[in-house]
């Protein structure tokens, strides 16, 4: 029984270290989302902070379309970050059993 608890504690420590490393990597990550065939691009960090917005001047005359494309590009970048986060956090816990219903990232 004591061996199981010690092993569990070691696994928890390793998982915590792996999760911290994955979070640090995600914080450095930059992802670009696009919309309108590349007419709008939005670059976000892994923490979903906006770093850059690029808009093709040809769409600026249609405000509603520009707004829609900016939102779509932002959502594209956000979805890419979510997927990358899920992948990296999943790798950080590889081989470790999480309780049912527990999801990552926390």
From Swiss-Prot:
Location of the protein in the cell:
Cytoplasm, Nucleoid
CC terms in the record's Gene Ontology section:
bacterial nucleoid; cytosol
InterPro entries from the xrefs? YbaB-like_sf, YbaB/EbfC
Regions of biased composition (Basic and acidic residues) lie at 80-89
The membrane-spanning stretches of this chain are: none
PANTHER family referenced in this protein's UniProt entry, alphabetically = NUCLEOID-ASSOCIATED PROTEIN YBAB
Question: What name appears for this protein in its UniProt entry?
Answer: Nucleoid-associated protein XAC1110
UniProt keyword annotation of DNA-binding present = yes
**What's in the keyword line of the UniProt record?**
Cytoplasm, DNA-binding
User: What GO molecular functions are on record for this protein?
Assistant: DNA binding
| Predominant localisation class | cytoplasm
Instruction: Name any one Pfam family assigned in the record.
Output: YbaB_DNA_bd
- Which family is it part of? Belongs to the YbaB/EbfC family.
Q: What does this protein do?
A: Binds to DNA and alters its conformation. May be involved in regulation of gene expression, nucleoid organization and DNA protection.
Q: Which domain of life is it from?
A: Bacteria
Q: Where is this region: Disordered?
A: 80-106
Tell me how this protein assembles: Homodimer.
Is the keyword Ubl conjugation in the record? no
């Amino acid at each position: 029984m004591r061996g199981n608890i010690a092993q569990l504690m070691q696994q928890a420590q390793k998982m915590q270290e792996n999760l911290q490393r994955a979070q640090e990597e995600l914080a450095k990550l930059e992802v670009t989302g696009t919309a309108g065939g590349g007419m709008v691009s939005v670059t976000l960090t892994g923490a979903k902070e906006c770093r850059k917005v690029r808009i093709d001047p040809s769409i600026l005359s249609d405000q509603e379309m520009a707004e829609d494309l900016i939102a779509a590009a932002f959502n594209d970048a956000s979805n890419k970050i979510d997927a990358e986060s899920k992948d990296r956090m999943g790798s950080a816990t590889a081989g470790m059993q999480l309780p049912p219903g527990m999801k990552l990232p926390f």
